[in-house]
Amino acid sequence: MIDLIARKRPPAGLRPALRASLSAAMQHFGGEEREVTVVLVGDPEIRALKLEHWGEDAATDVLSFPTWEPGDPFMPPHLGDIIISLDTAQRQAESRGHSLTREVALLASHGLTHLVGHDHPHAEGLGFEEGATGEDWQVFHDAWAAAQTGLPAGA
């Protein structure tokens, strides 16, 4: 189940596309019976969260808050929360030449990958969708490939 909370209004069509793509990524991880909360916000909100939890005073595209840690004896029904800044996502979509819907789906798949227990090295600003490679990144590429299968044509 995907609980979608919009604290910043997304454009028409984004919500169903996000649900479909994230559902495909959850199925990829075998987590279709799990729950995830996605919160769509603006830069001020995500900046405040990043400052509070990571000590960095800057907006970002996506933050993940898992409810469990790898190595815990079981995975709970609710995997955690994914927070996405629609402001940052819009800028990134424009610079990458694709839609906001596609960018938000990409960010959600990235956040989900963190929620199921995977991490990646910091890539000096290079995002996984921009060519970051290596074993640690492959799981993120695979999640995005799965998420894309749920996107509507032209998204």
UniProtKB/Swiss-Prot annotation:
Keyword Transit peptide included in the entry's annotation: no
Compartments reported by the entry: Cytoplasm
An individual GO BP term: rRNA processing
EC number(s) from the headed UniProt entry: 3.1.-.-
Cellular component terms (Gene Ontology): cytoplasm
InterPro entries per the UniProt record, alphabetical: MetalPrtase_cat_dom_sf_prd (IPR023091), YbeY (IPR002036), YbeY_CS (IPR020549)
Family of the protein in this entry: Belongs to the endoribonuclease YbeY family.
Functional note: Single strand-specific metallo-endoribonuclease involved in late-stage 70S ribosome quality control and in maturation of the 3' terminus of the 16S rRNA.
Annotated protein name in UniProt: Endoribonuclease YbeY
Taxonomy of the source species: Bacteria, Thermotogati, Deinococcota, Deinococci, Deinococcales
